[in-house]
Amino acid sequence: MPRLSTFSIAAFDPDDGAWGVAVASKFPAVGAVVPWAKSGAGAVATQAMGNTSFGARGLEMMAAGRSAQETLDALLADDVGREHRQVGAVDAAGQAATFTGKECLAWAGGRTGEHFAIQGNILTGPEVVDAMAQAFRLDSGDLADRLMAALLAGDRAGGDRRGRQSAALFVVKPQAGYGGFNDIWLDYRVDDDPDPVPRLVELLAIHRLYFGKSPADDQIPIAGEVATQLQRIMASLGYYGGPVSGAYDETTRSALTAFIGNENFEDRTDFAAGQIDRPVFDYLLRKFGG
């Protein structure tokens, strides 16, 4: 069985009630193996010659009230391959634990801190996990931002000494899934790419673009130059056949409704009030020109 030469972070955000894992590896589709998380239970990262049963079993144990350390102790107690395993966990209370078996290939090791467990194997050196820990502590964003800051810091510090191939971000919090029907807030994977961590950063930005919402002071009126640029874009794409006047009239509104609908930004455009979220407008300009 190939080893998952990997660096990962499992973490908890008590303010948001979120648990998650970010991971990168010189191995394809690392997101299918390493990250596990369950709202109200915790998060697990299982790697090296990873025992994938540690994911579901570990979450079940922590959901039943075991701490992260108690969970790792129980998982490893009867595992004949324990010295080839590397695993980190953060429990329902945010307590963290990490384990690196003696047979994991160098450099291998981990760090724990308040609400996080970091671990890696076949790394360029301990500077990778140290950089990850510092980045997680210093970032002031939400859990997804902090996880990605840590992963990017580890990647920039050297990461997997064999190279780069895949990365993943998995985050859960209560009713954060699409439509509020489950707890999966973020589940993004870059399965085979020469530079997967920056690509994963881009995917998180895309998620925020489509599912975010701007504050009132970042919503701009569709009038004047904004309307003119949108009319030009829509005319070039065949949505709009009227004059490029800068007026938000009924013809423009009808065309914009169709255009924005096809681009999936209905929730970030107020057609009745004639307003659009600035990040969406900026994105449309970059994508289509103005």
What are these model-predicted stretches?
Residues 218-289:
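Short acidic, glycine/serine/threonine-rich helix-capping segments at coil-helix boundaries
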Residues 1-2, 290:
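Basic/polar N-terminal segments that are highly enriched at the extreme N-terminus
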Residues 2-224:
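N-terminal nucleophile
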